[in-house]
Structure formats: structure tokens, C-alpha cells
Amino acid sequence: MAPPTRENPKVLLVEDNEMNRDMLARRLRKIGYEVEIAVNGQEGVIKATQDRPDIVLMDMSLPVMDGWEATRNLKANPDTQQIPVIALTAHAMASDREKAMAAGCDEYDTKPIDWSRLMGKVDALINQPPQSLS
């Protein structure tokens, strides 16, 4: 996998499963990403608001606040609405993708994670020009 084109892009990984979290964080760091971790949706919203990552990888089945609600919160906040969010979920039905997009996710990927597919989505979202809100 090629390194990111931006220098040290910051990823917020919101994942409660320790094994998934450690594997993804390790692989992201290995190729040059700075990784911040949150273990539930509420913590993810707080960290995204404080740290302003370049992208959020959001598990949808989270304790305290699920990924759907966390994404809606991020997209409703003018300070975080431009941060791309990729939904990570074990649910692979077409209706699940539609639910993710309706919540405000910019992309959707299923578990188990296909590393190349996920990184293609991450790279595309990080390297797209910012959208104007006007």
C-alpha cells in the first residue's frame, strides 16, 4: 500500500473491538498516518471536535453512542461537518449502506476489512478538495 499523499494525515479510529482497533491502527501508522483512538461514539464526537482529524473511520455498533448517532452529531456541527466519515460495519445489506449515507457518512465499508479497498476509500476522501458550504 502506498503511503498517504498528504504529510502525516490524521485518522480518528472509532472502534470498540480491541483486536480490530489494534490491527487497523498498527497498519495505518505503518504507512504514515497519525492515528487517534476512540472506543465509543460519544468519545469519537469529542475527539473529532477537539482534534479535527482529516478523516474518521467509524464503527457503527458502538457502546454509549452508536456510530449512526455519532456521525449525525459530527455532520450537524459546523466545526466537524466537513470531516469525511467512513462507516465500518459487519452489516452488508444495501439498506445498511443507505442508512450510513442517510446518517451523513461519506463512504461505507464492510467487515471483515479488505485493507486495499478501505485504503482506496481513505485516500480518495483525504485527497479530495474541500467542499464549499456556500
Identify the role of each PLM range.
Residues 22-30:
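Charged docking surfaces used in two-component/phosphorelay signaling
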Residues 32-39, 47:
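Short hydrophobic/Thr-rich beta-strand motif most characteristic of the beta2 strand and flanking loop
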Residues 25, 112-122:
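C-terminal output helix
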Residues 63, 81, 93, 111:
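The feature encodes the CheY-like receiver
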Residues 15:
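Conserved acidic carboxylate
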